[in-house]
């Protein structure tokens, strides 16, 4: 068990969660490069909480900055429900997994955005083939020194 100095105070923290979902054809189960319809449909309701990613078969959602885990859980649940509904309206489904089991990365369209174009130009197939889907938890800590100690 790690020793914690009695002078060590618990830091105040915030958190945010981002999830990247696969956009899937419900009949073939292949990835579909139709993220734009989901993102555009979601902008009215979810505003900046729904985003495009480099591959058009990926849709990303992200919580606001949350004050605790309970608030983050509620937002994540809501975002999952909303992105599933948005996909359903387009005749698609979403899935959460690290990668797709059989869709070819070569078949995936790249989102038209200067940042992604630069990444593809510099990294080429290493970037194109990086067809992964993640869940990211971002933690904000009010004291940098304590943050470094926690990371160590």
Report the location of each language-model feature.
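Terminal catalytic/cofactor-binding subdomain
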Residues: 1-126, 131-133
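Histidine/acidic-residue-rich, glycine-tolerant segments that coordinate divalent metal ions
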Residues: 140
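An acidic/histidine-cluster motif and surrounding catalytic segment
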Residues: 137
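Helical (often loop-to-helix) elements that flank the catalytic cores of nucleotide-handling enzymes
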Residues: 113, 119-120, 143-152
